[in-house]
Regions:
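The feature captures the beta-strand-to-loop junction immediately N-terminal to the Walker
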Residues: 36-38
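Helix-to-loop junction immediately C-terminal to a conserved catalytic motif
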Residues: 51
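Conserved ABC transporter NBD signature motif
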Residues: 59-71
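Conserved ABC ATPase "signature" region
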Residues: 95, 106-122
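Catalytic Walker B motif of ABC-type/P-loop ATPase nucleotide-binding domains
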Residues: 150-154
Length: 210
């Protein structure tokens, strides 16, 4: 289990646009951290950098003091408005992802489906899922490998009160398991009720701790 993630002066440029500027952040295991800010402020890009989906232009990203290749962190990520294969069932989508990543077992998939409350509908095609059900399935794929680091981008969008409570419960359970949990949200209740530390991002800059 990764004990600490450190971002040192992370900057990300796309063309002539600077999306992230000199981001410094340290996160420790068993804690829930929050990032808030307006749409387009850089929250999702920061998540993508930590997950390894994009590389920073400058700066260091360290896991227990090591680079990604040496540390080989297990990272689960739930990105807002992401999608899966529409003609596959929820369970089939998870099995496909598991076969690609080669980290989750059938038991892990079963556990994730139960935890997000999709057992009654896991054989329904993704196309027929409601927005809330799609969010739950995306959460399931993020947690099914019991990640060291769990990144959640607006996880409570498009879900009802019961779903919000479920997301909060899973975040707390993952932190209790020892994971580092990072939540990006503009929902004040999510941020205030769950996170030990909250950071504000504006125009790619981490301005202050709330």
């Amino acid at each position: 289990m990764i004990q600490e993630v450190t971002l040192e002066n992370i900057t990300k440029q796309i063309g002539k646009t600077t999306v992230l500027t000199d981001i410094c952040l340290t996160m420790k295991c068993g804690q829930i951290y929050g990032i808030t800010g307006e749409n387009g402020s850089g929250k999702t890009m920061l998540m993508r950098v930590i997950a390894g989906l994009v590389s920073p232009s400058t700066g260091k990203l360290l896991f227990d003091g090591k680079n990604r290749a040496d540390a080989n962190p297990n990272i689960g990520i739930m990105i807002e408005n992401a999608s899966l294969y529409p003609e596959l069932s929820g369970r089939e989508n998870l099995r496909l992802l598991a076969s690609i990543r080669k980290q989750a077992t059938n038991e892990d998939i079963d556990r994730a489906i139960r935890r997000v409350g999709l057992e009654p509908t896991d054989k329904r095609t993704f196309r027929k899922y409601s927005l809330g059900m799609k969010q739950r399935l995306m959460l399931a794929q993020a947690i099914m490998e019991q990640p060291d680091v769990l990144l959640l981008d607006e996880p409570t969008n498009a879900i009802d009160k019961k779903g919000v409570e479920l997301v909060h419960q899973i975040m707390s359970e993952e932190a209790s398991r020892g994971a580092i949990v990072l939540l990006a949200s503009h929902v004040d209740y999510d941020i205030r009720s769950l996170c030990s530390k909250v950071f504000w991002i504006e125009k790619g800059k981490m301005q202050l701790e709330v």
